[in-house]
Structure formats: structure tokens, C-alpha cells
Amino acid sequence: MARVKGGVVSRKRRKRVLKLAKGYYGAKHILFRTAKEQVMNSYYYAYRDRRQRKRDFRKLWITRINAAARMNGLSYSQLMHGLKLAEVEVNRKMLADLAVNDAAAFTVLADAAKEKLGK
């Protein structure tokens, strides 16, 4: 039986890693060992930052809602509490969109919150 050395498989594996490392800076897209390390790190960063992105967007929405709420004489927490008392079920993403693109509609919601808070 002939001896199998596995050159084809190794080349295919290395080629796959180097293809994933395409566009990386310096030796990280040329040398197999550094490319492999960087690809592994990239997978880690992608996994971590998919979760981070959710936190970042929520933070952005809250900042936008707070700015619009203060233009209407309320703080963010007062607005959210007032909306809960008024039984208005609008999520933060929708509120932030209203704050940026439809100030009149946001003002209506802020007035409803003020009314329930007794302001």
C-alpha cells in the first residue's frame, strides 16, 4: 500500500485560513501561523461584538430619548415611568425613531406621560 503524506489536505487547510485572513495588515495575511491566530481572534471579536452591538444600540436609543424628553420638560426616567402609567407600550427603538424623525408624535407621547405624572 502506498504511503499517504497528506500534502493536499494540509494545503487546502492553509489556503482556507489564508483566504479568511485576506485583507489583514502586515504578515497576518501572508504567514499561515500568524494568519491562523488572527482568524481565531477575529472569530472571538465577532462573537463578542455581536452581543456588544445590542448594548450599544440600546445606549444610543436611550440617549436620543433622553435628549427629546428634556426638550419636553421631562427626564428619561420620568418619561418612561409616565408612559408605563399611561399604558403606552412603545419600545425604546420606536421612541428613539420618533424622537429623531417625528418630533410632533414624540411630543404627544410626552404630553400623555406628563398627564399621568400630574405635571
Swiss-Prot record:
- CDD domains xrefs: Ribosomal_L20 (cd07026)
- Taxonomic superkingdom: Bacteria
Going by the UniProt record, its keywords in alphabetical order are: Ribonucleoprotein, Ribosomal protein, RNA-binding, rRNA-binding
**Which Gene Ontology biological process is one annotated for this entry?**
ribosomal large subunit assembly
Any one Gene Ontology cellular component term annotated for this protein: ribonucleoprotein complex
GO molecular function annotation: rRNA binding; structural constituent of ribosome
Q: What does this protein do?
A: Binds directly to 23S ribosomal RNA and is necessary for the in vitro assembly process of the 50S ribosomal subunit. It is not involved in the protein synthesizing functions of that subunit.
Q: Which HAMAP family match?
A: Ribosomal_bL20 (MF_00382)
Family statement: Belongs to the bacterial ribosomal protein bL20 family.
Protein name per its UniProtKB record? Large ribosomal subunit protein bL20
Gene (UniProt): rplT
